Every structure is written in structure tokens, then in C-alpha cells.
Amino acid sequence: MLTITPNFAQERALRLLRSEWKSHRTFMISSPTGSGKTALAAFITHGCNSRNMRVMFVVPYTILIEQTAARFIDYGIPMEDIGFVWRDHPNYDPTRLIQIASADTLIRREFPDNIDLLFIDEAHLRRKKLLEVIRDNEFKVIGLSGTPFSPFLGTYYERLIKPTTMKELIERGDLSPYEFYAPTKPDLSAVKSTSSAEYGSDYKEAEIAAIMSGADLVGDVVDNWLANGQNLPTICFCVTVSHANFVTVAFNWAGVNAEIITADTPHEERQLIIHRFEQGGTKIIVNVGTLVAGFDSDVRC
């Protein structure tokens, strides 16, 4: 028995899914941060498990594996129903009704043949082998994303479910209103792009990092934060590690306590940085692709 009840966005999503369930096999649920996509997945998973159906929930980042399991358990799903597909996790058990899987681990193994429903979290991230799994099987698939704007998604997901919008969540008070400040616009016209079957097209990292690390642009970022950031807890996203180091040093020179987290930052050190951030000792965490999901600290800028 779950310990939570659906909020307004989850009620809408469940109603829309029920009305389309028999007509389509694959669904994309487009819903912003703060709307409760993980809880929505828990409601659907609980319903499937009550009919002895097996569910797999695939996440793109390792930080989301234990976090998703913890959320499911908090919502009332029994811990003994959850197995893990992640490296050599001690709770690997393919017989359990719920499998929480790392995308990187899953695509390197033979896909299980007993799954009835597959969730793809952060489904806008292109993983070629996962897309092949969606295409080549007959089980139901639900993609979850706050930004499902990539054109390739329409090839694999038949039906779009959009239960709410960021505007509605802000008007209800579920999300904070926001302001944009962009004092300097970098010239990216000469930056080349690169593409791959796995991740699609994007700017070349080295070229865009050189522009984003320009002294004028970084200086404007620091000056703008000092003028408008109001000393609020802040997350800064950078292109490369060298870019992040440059930005961190610039904030430190300005007297702002900023720290850096990258993919190579050990887990224990990362937790200490986050703890200092939550306690107010660190004002800014500068990161490179590490705090893009599953970061629950209070951030105001």
C-alpha cells in the first residue's frame, strides 16, 4: 500500500495514460521539475506489481540509482521487491518485481526477457542501445523527461503525455518564479559542431570552452552574480574541467567561497562539498555535468 496520494499533475498523467494505454505501446511523459515524475512512476509501478507485472526503471546517472530506490521505499514500495542492475551491486536479483538499472550497466548486458513495463528516466538523453531495446521489443515503455525536445524521440515514442507546465507550477507556487540575466552574449558563430549516433549533435567542447573561459565573459559572470546573486546558494554549470577551474578561481579572487565538482571528484569529497554548501559555508558549486539530475539541495541561483 502506497503512503502517498497523487497530486494534481500525477492525477492528470494517470488519467491520460489510462485513456491511451490500449491504443499505444510507448509513451513520453513531459513534465517539469517539481511535478513529481518519480512519484508518478511509483504509482504506475505499484499498479503493475499488484498484477504481478515486472517493471524496470532505467536511470542515466549513478546518483539516481539509490535515490530512486529510496524514494520508492519512502512511498511505500517494499524494499524486498526492488533489485538493482548496476555493476556488482549486492542486491542484484532478476527475480524481483522491480529492477532499478544503470543505463551504462544495462546496455553492456543481455536485456532481460521478463519485463512488462520499461521506464526510461531523463529520456531525452540519447542512448542508441536503449533506443534499439524500445524499437525491438513489444513491452510497454514510458519515457520521463522535463525537456523532451530532441527530434529523434518522435521515432520511438508514439504518444506524448503532458500533464502540466512550468508556468502552471509557478502560478500554483510549486516552483519559484525566475529571472534571467545575460550581460554578455558570446559569439558562437565560428564554433564547429560534432555528432555521434549515441549523443547527437553538439558544439566541440574544446572550442566552446575557449570562448566561455574568456576573461571578459567570466568576469561578467562574477560581476553579475555579485550585483544580482544576493549571496544566494548558487550552482554554476561549465563546459569542461579547465573552464570550471577558471570560473572557480575567478569567484575565489572576488572573495566568494566557490568549490568545484567534476566526474573525477570522489564520492566522499563530493558529499563534503554538498554539506558545506547546504550549511552556507560554500556559496557556489561549480560543476561539469555532475549536478544535472538528482540534486536536492536548496538552490536559489
Where in this protein do the model-derived segments appear?
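Conserved helicase ATPase core of P-loop NTP-dependent helicases/translocases
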Residues: 66, 81-94, 235, 244-252, ...
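Walker A/P-loop
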Residues: 23-45, 237, 261
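Conserved Walker A/P-loop ATP-binding site and its immediately adjacent core
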Residues: 38-43, 47-74, 241-242
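Conserved pre-motif I regulatory segment
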Residues: 1-30
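Post-DEXD/H (motif II) to motif III coupling segment of the RecA-like Helicase ATP-binding lobe
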Residues: 122-181
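Conserved interdomain linker/interface between the two RecA-like ATPase lobes of SF2 helicase motors
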Residues: 160-238
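Inter-Walker segment of RecA-like/P-loop motor cores
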Residues: 73-111
